[in-house]
């Protein structure tokens, strides 16, 4: 009778270990996938940030948009107004 209980006990331990091993294996797999996805997300964010910095080939482009011919007549008036105290 003791041998039967011992065999059943060992079988129970083996089944429990097999289930927990599969659970642990699945959990490790999920953690690794999660870390990989987080790393990829961080790298894509870094690439997006770098592309924004590098993308602007002409940083003074907004200066060219100003219509200087329309603004030039007003410059003396602005200077005179700024010079008065």
UniProtKB/Swiss-Prot annotation:
Propeptide: 19-57
Signal sequence region: 1-18
Main location: secreted
Keyword Disulfide bond found: no
Residues modified to Alanine amide: 82
Alphabetic keyword roster: Amidation, Antibiotic, Antimicrobial, Immunity, Innate immunity, Membrane, Secreted, Signal, Target cell membrane, Target membrane
Localization: Secreted; Target cell membrane
Any one GO CC term of the record: extracellular region
Keyword Membrane applies: yes
Organs and tissues of expression: Expressed in entodermal epithelium along the body column.
Family membership noted in the UniProt record: Belongs to the arminin family.
Function, in words: Antimicrobial peptide with a broad-spectrum antimicrobial activity. Keeps its antibacterial activity under a wide range of salt concentrations that mimic physiological conditions of human blood, which is surprising, since Hydra is an obligate freshwater animal with nearly no salt tolerance. Does not affect red blood cells.
Protein name (record): Arminin 2b
